[in-house]
Amino acid sequence: MSEKKTVRVALVRSPIGTRESHRATVRGLGLRKVNSESVLEDTPAVRGMINKISYLVKVL
């Protein structure tokens, strides 16, 4: 069995004052408050979401 790769992201800036689509992307990644972390499956879709809001999140 192969183990699926994961990526851990943390919200480091507040999405207040950002575009609605960026706030929706933050929520889609499972992030709520500043410094909250989420462990996600490493897929192209998730990578694209991280790239879109790279100024708000940090990959750990």
Curated annotation (Swiss-Prot):
HAMAP family registered for this protein in UniProt: Ribosomal_uL30_B
Any one GO biological process: translation
GO cellular component terms attached to this protein's record: cytosolic large ribosomal subunit
Superkingdom, natural source: Bacteria
Gene giving rise to this polypeptide: rpmD
Name assigned to this protein: Large ribosomal subunit protein uL30
Cited Gene3D superfamilies: Ribosomal protein L30, ferredoxin-like fold domain
Cystine pairings recorded for this chain: none
Entry's family note: Belongs to the universal ribosomal protein uL30 family.
The keyword Isomerase is annotated on this UniProt entry: no
This protein's record includes keyword Amino-acid biosynthesis: no
Subunit composition and interactions: Part of the 50S ribosomal subunit.
InterPro entries the record matches: Ribo_uL30_ferredoxin-like_sf (IPR036919), Ribosomal_uL30_bac-type (IPR005996), Ribosomal_uL30_ferredoxin-like (IPR016082)
GO molecular function terms attached to this record: structural constituent of ribosome
Keywords associated with the record: Ribonucleoprotein, Ribosomal protein
